[in-house]
Amino acid sequence: MAHLSDLDIANQSELKPIGEIAEKAGIPADALEQYGHYKAKIDINQIKPKDNKGKVVLVTAMSPTPAGEGKSTVTVGLSDAFNELKKNVMVALREPALGPTFGIKGGATGGGYAQVLPMEDINLHFNGDFHAITTANNALSAFIDNHIHQGNELGIDVRRVEWKRVLDMNDRALRHVNVGLGGPTNGVPREDGFNITVASEVMAILCLARNINDLKEKISRITIGYTRDRKPVTVADLKVEGALAMILKDAIKPNLVQTIEGTPALVHGGPFANIAHGCNSILATETARDLADIVVTEAGFGSDLGAEKFIDIKAREAGFEPSAVVLVATVRALKMHGGVAKDDLKEENVEAVKAGIVNLERHVNNIRKFGVEPVIALNAFIHDTDAETEAVKAWAKENNVRIALTEVWEKGGKGGVELANQVLEVIEQPNDFKFLYDLDQSLEEKIETIVKDIYGGSSVTFSKKAKKQLKEFTDNGWGQYPICMAKTQYSFSDDATALGAPTDFDITIRELEAKTGAGFIVALTGAIMTMPGLPKKPAALNMDVTEDGHAVGLF
């Protein structure tokens, strides 16, 4: 039987006017800034904070296959399932990046009958947030180069400008560039480079800011580079934090859309979890908590990346904790971690499923280290067999792990009711929530804690450059910041081919980046890139637009 594509399902769905969705969510009319019929921004100053805020349900996953395991789909479907159960719920998601949409994964608004809409708009330009973030980032680059050109009063060392330009595109050719060429009138020549917009510190700041003043304060703390005597230079030194915050004055407002089943959805911010902190904005999550009793949100990739950063960076900054954690698993990912080649994942292989459970088991144990009991959402795919599914359920029962077969892709909210009921039971129980590390530990200790306790590694090797940076950053007063690991999403290690649950491995930290505006230190491992490239056959090859302006090929 042929299944409709995600885009076909989205196009056949009947959207409600965004005013109706806002009314359902309890958003007052004067807080709604409409972008057409089905999208809006929310003026958070018009939302009345409530004392008894909604509970946060975090959705994370096991180590994924390149195609992803349907974490966004489960997040959306779970919110619709709570809606089925007549719960006051909102879903809070990240915005998709445009670059990867044309790369491997295609769109990122859920799938099947568990999607946020309007899917085309959200996956392409949405309400312009990423463009504003890109503009603010690159305006800062222009201000830096202009300052150097106009006499360099601050004494910025052109060899030590840390700030890079960004673009919301996968474009490997821009990783390393030279700027200021062509003679004295074109500026001072120096090496530069581009990151993808989702790796920009401006993106991280937007997602961690509590209000416009906090946004401005965080922007002012950005370290753009160093003087010739190695003193940090900040945006405050350039006196442009006001201008940059002004560019972001609308982007900071959360975006309101809806699921196929009419559940209110806040989609705002979009840092990657392998090269950034991987969570939607604090503002969107907190706004949802002021409006709903349950807020379902997600953090990128596996629990070793997104969930760890959600807890140790976002939740710590925002001052809340997850009341439940959903761990998305799939039969195909289990088979991959059990040794099955990518091209054979559709074939039944119960033994490989059992062998791959070691990966899922480590993710379960990792969530428990934060004092929260996980619920496994076994996300159903059409090629799964009963024997494979039962093997996972049997393991979960034997090891006292909550599990629910989740069929939201095919059935929408009704396919997630079992999962929702299990999550409700966890929410009602007390937990022993705790962070993985204390901020007063050294940067080195915090990195080692993540590697040993979450990844299962035995040691950390710091490159000569990273060792030097550890001392410099600590001397600069940045030792109290949390850590944001930049690591492959496919393995617990820094080797993407080491699947399953590797042990006794060493992780190499090749360099550190001080994100003093966002308030964390990025530790770069392996060959991780902050500007991705496109695959040999990008998803763009299957995309088109019809004569009447409808997108084709957005999955």
UniProtKB/Swiss-Prot annotation:
InterPro entries (UniProt xref): Formate_THF_ligase, Formate_THF_ligase_CS, P-loop_NTPase
Keyword Ligase: yes
SUPFAM superfamilies in UniProt: P-loop containing nucleoside triphosphate hydrolases
Highest taxon listed in the record's lineage: Bacteria
GO biological process, one term: tetrahydrofolate interconversion
GO molecular function, one term: formate-tetrahydrofolate ligase activity
Record keyword Aminoacyl-tRNA synthetase present: no
Enzyme class: ligase
CDD domains registered for this protein in UniProt: FTHFS (cd00477)
Pathway participation: One-carbon metabolism; tetrahydrofolate interconversion
EC id: 6.3.4.3
Key words, A-Z: ATP-binding, Ligase, Nucleotide-binding, One-carbon metabolism
Disulfide bonds: none
Record: residues binding ATP: 65-72
Reactions catalysed according to its record: (6S)-5,6,7,8-tetrahydrofolate + formate + ATP = (6R)-10-formyltetrahydrofolate + ADP + phosphate
Family: Belongs to the formate--tetrahydrofolate ligase family.
Name this polypeptide is given: Formate--tetrahydrofolate ligase
Organism per entry: Staphylococcus haemolyticus (strain JCSC1435)
Gene name for this UniProt entry: fhs
